[in-house]
Amino acid sequence: VGKILDALKENGIDDNTLFVFTSDNGPWLLYGNHGGSAGALREGKGTRFEGGFRVPCVMRWPAKIPDGSVCSELAGSMDLLPTLAAIVGTRLPQKRIIDGKDIRPLMYGESGARSPHAAFYYFSPDGLVGVRSGRWKMLYPHNYNVPLQPGMDGMHGKYGRKSIDLALFDLSTDVGETKNLASQYPEVIEQLESLAEIARKDIGSRSEPGPNSRPIGR
């Protein structure tokens, strides 16, 4: 990273170059000492917990991004395409569904800027597993993989299985997803259920595909 930044500076283009450093997913804990660490986050890659999805993102653009600014609003790598297109003035294809949003207000530290995503959905190959809106994240009952016997030195280990009941987490105070608040906030569950229904009608599941479902990975 340092060498890249040095090269930008040496060529006199660092002030007006957007530099993005991020990851596509959390640590693959099955690989043990080569798998990384999720720190205070729950689980890792392959799950719908924060350890699988929440990743660091560092952006540098001296001409546009305020030095030392921090953003805690929800955004993801899918937002890079529409954001970069907007920056360079390129129109997005009209015949494709683009899931990402333009997050320039968040990048530029604009006062009062909020996440453009009303909801963020968590899917598995079988269908919808959870939904997040703002500070609240709801997960439906499902089974998930955990490292039963982590590997070592680049070799993967063995998976075990765990299950979770209907769960509600307040990520503003419990980023580790340790306190299930589902029974305490039925009104929040109801709100998130209404958002989940939108995704069900749009994407559907493996057994009942929605009008905008598409093959995994596409």
Provide a role label for each language-model segment.
Residues 13-19, 54, 116-117, 133-136, ...:
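Loop/turn elements at helix/coil->beta-strand transitions in domains of secreted/extracellular proteins
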Residues 185, 189-196:
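Short amphipathic alpha-helical coiled-coil/interface segments
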Residues 25-26:
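Active-site metal-binding loops of divalent metal-dependent hydrolases
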Residues 45, 49-50, 122-182:
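C-terminal, low-complexity/hydrophilic appendages and adjacent surface loops
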Residues 18-22, 40, 57-60, 82-86, ...:
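Structural recognition of the beta-strand scaffold that forms the well-ordered cores
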Residues 114-117, 196-212:
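Bilobed periplasmic-binding protein-like "clamshell/Venus-flytrap" ligand-binding domains
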Residues 2-10, 30-31, 37-97, 101-114, ...:
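Substrate-binding rim/cap in mid-to-C-terminal beta-strand-loop elements of soluble/periplasmic
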Residues 15-16, 92-95, 204-210:
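Surface-exposed patches in mature extracellular/periplasmic domains of secreted proteins
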